[in-house]
Amino acid sequence: MLMRDENAKVMMLMPVDSTKHFQARVYWNKYSRETYIDILSLPDPGEGKQYQLWALTAGNPVDAGIFILPNDAGMQRLKNIIEADQWAVTIEPTGGSLNPSLDQMILISKNS
């Protein structure tokens, strides 16, 4: 199980806007490249919008996948990621974007 795997990193994502109480956790294994997200608190992104996770390496974003707000979904498996120094979540049009909408960044992790 990824949470108990000693090779898995757990990264806490905190709100970009410190007045908000949004949170998520990313579980990432750099060897198997598996990536999961566990949503702790996020609002509905709005009509025609969806959340997207980004892996950041030297400031360059890589699409880690789009995800839905959980009802009973628990952790959601996203794309395999080769390398990441940091993680971010943006609100994007449904289906995701090739590049992050930086003005719509809602969560970010500290550097790993």
Language-model segments: what does each one mean?
Residues 1-112:
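N-terminal targeting/export leaders
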